[in-house]
Amino acid sequence: MRLLVSATRVQDGAVRVFRTKAISLEVVLASACLPRLHHAVDIHGEPHWDGGYAANPPVIPLVGASRTSEVLLIQLIPTDHTGLPVTKAEIDKRLGQITFNAPLQKELEAIGMMKTLLHKEGQPTSRLGRKIQSLQLHHLSAEDYVDDLSQASVLDTKWDFLTHLRDRGRAAAEAWLSPEAGVRS
């Protein structure tokens, strides 16, 4: 099984993608390290934070490492927001959403541009080019099922809350699945 875990290098904000054999306890801790809640995690002498700041998720490396041309992207953080956030809590929540969605939006735009260029130029010569050209990206958005959660919910590890999240995830998956699953998304 192939596994990718990303962390953000604090020094320059670059994404670090760790593949299966390079994944350690420190890498996993860094990949979820929110700097306002925990100090940076040291990996080989360099401090790292949550990978979501630089790649959320690292789609292009995932496509490059994958053996399939189909990727299912499950998006938990809302991209759209109605109304103007006014209170400190609302503003903080929306800023967090924008911050963690920005890398994904940039990667999806880059993939779209690459697919357009590859289509114009014909058969790509690189392995990654061929993978991008044939990529079928399916998008399951769970934002309608998690948007009402407070920012503090990321710290909630109670079993009842976790099973509630699981149930919401299942509802989002059921809404996404249809007779056309795998054909159109």
Feature map (PLM): residue ranges:
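Active-site glycine-rich loop that binds ribose-phosphate moieties when present
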Residues: 25-40, 51-57
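A residue-level signal for conserved active-site and pocket-lining positions in enzyme catalytic cores
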Residues: 5, 28, 169
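Alpha/beta-hydrolase-fold catalytic nucleophile elbow
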Residues: 5-6, 31, 74
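Patatin-like phospholipase catalytic region
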Residues: 1-18, 40-44
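Non-catalytic peripheral regions of patatin-like phospholipases
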Residues: 9-11, 19-24, 46, 52-185
